Amino acid sequence: MSKCPRCFTALNPNQYLWTLPEQSGGTRYRDEVATAYSGAPADCGPLYTWSRSPGYNGPPPPTSEATRALQAPAVEICPVCHFTLPEGWREGHAICIALAGARATGKSLYIAVLVKQLELLCERFGVSMQPVTRGTAQAYATNYETPLYVQRGLIPPTPTVRTQTSDHREPLMFSLGIWHGVRRFLVLRDVAGEDMESGDLHAPPFRFFAHADAVFFMFDPLRVKTIRDQLHDLLPAQVVSGGDPRTVLTNVLTAVSPGQPKLAVILSKFDVLRALRDVEGSEWGLIMSNGGAAYLRDTSDGQQYDETDGQLLHEEVRSLLLRLHGGSILAAVENPATGVRLQSRNFVVSALGHPPSGNRLHARGIAPFRCVDPIRWVTSGFGVL
C-alpha cells in the first residue's frame, strides 16, 4: 500500500477520488481541504468519487470511468488532502521522510547533497533515480541544486508554510526503480525551522509527521557555546541563529504522536567537530583524533546498510551528544514525555565536508560525509538500497 506524498496517509484501496486539472478549463471551486493541507488557497474542478460497496471484491474503476463522468481527462487525487497523485503512484511503494530541526541546522544543504549521493548510489545498484514529476525536478533545481552546485553558495532558509511559493510546497518525489518486483518511491518533506520552533504543528499542513516512515531530526553542534569557543580561530566566521534544539525536538515528538515513525537523530555539520582535531591540548582534539572511531569512517556507500556499523555509530554519537551537553535531547528520545518511545538511531553527517566561508563554499568544494546513512537505515527495512 502506497502513501500520499503530501499528507503521508496510506492510500485506502476502498476509496478513490478524481478531479479535473486546471488546464482542462471549466468551472473551478475553492477546495477547502487542499487549502487546509497546503497552507495556501487552492481550488479544484468537479469531483468524482468511488467507494467500495459491501461484498464487492473486484478492482476499482479505471481513471477512464472518471474521465467519462467528468467529460474531460481526469486525474486522481488523495481522498484525504486532495493532492494530485502521480500516475502509477498507487501501484508503487512510497517511503516517506520528514526532515525537522531548528533554523540554520543545514536541512536544505543536506537535501541538496543527499539527492546527488543517492543518485550515485542507485547507479552502483544498476537502477536510475529520477524525479517523479516535473514539479519535483523544477523544485530541486531551483531551491537546492542551483544555489549550491551552480552558484557555489549556501541555500536560503526554507520559507514558512505561510510564505512558501508553489515549488517549495511541492514534496520532493523520486523514483528509485524496481526493487523486489515493486516500483519504489522516496518522498522528502522539509519544514522551515521557524515553523518547527513556533508553528502550530497540529494544523493540517504538518499532520504528515504522524504518518511518516521516518523523521530526521537534525542538531547543529555550533549551538553549543563551548564548541564555538574552541573553534573560534579555526573556522571562518559563522552566523549562529535558530531556536533551542530541545524545544524543536519536543515539538517534533508532539507532532508525530500518535504515529510511530523511525526517528533519526542527526548531528549535522560534522565537519565542524572534525576541525577540533587541530585544537592542541584539547579534550575534543583527542576525541576527534581517534582513528578507530566509526564517526570518522564513511562506510555509507557499501553494498548494503551495515547494521553493525550503524549500532556502533549510534553509541558513539550518543557519547558525543552527552559531551555536547545534549543529555536533554537523549532523554527526550529515550524517555519521551508522550510515554511512547520511537525506534531511534543516532547519526553524524556533513553535507559540505568543509565549513563554508560566510555564504560561500569552502575553496576545496563539496565533500559529503555519511549523508546516505540515515536514508539507508530506513530503506533497508524495505529491502531497498
Swiss-Prot record:
Subcellular localization: Cytoplasm
Keyword entries, A-Z: Cytoplasm
GO cellular component: cytoplasm
This protein's record includes keyword Cytoplasm: yes
Disruption phenotype: Secretes greatly reduced amounts of EsxB, protein is synthesized intracellularly. In single deletion mutant EccCb1 only rarely localizes near the cell pole, while disruption of the probable saeA-saeB-saeC operon completely blocks polar localization of EccCb1. Loss of DNA conjugation when disrupted in recipient strain (MKD8).
Main location, first listed in the record: cytoplasm
Keyword field contains Cytoplasm: yes
Role of this protein: May be involved in assembly of the ESX-1 / type VII specialized secretion system (T7SS), which exports several proteins including EsxA and EsxB. Involved in DNA conjugation in recipient (MKD8) strain.
Other remarks in the entry: DNA conjugation in M.smegmatis is unidirectional with distinct donor and recipient strains; mc(2)155 is a donor strain while MKD8 is a recipient strain. Mutations in a donor strain that alter DNA transfer do not always alter DNA transfer in a recipient strain.
Entry protein name: Putative ESX-1 scaffolding and assembly protein SaeC
Organism: Mycolicibacterium smegmatis (strain ATCC 700084 / mc(2)155) (Mycobacterium smegmatis)
Lineage, highest ranks first: Bacteria, Bacillati, Actinomycetota, Actinomycetes, Mycobacteriales
Encoding gene per record: saeC
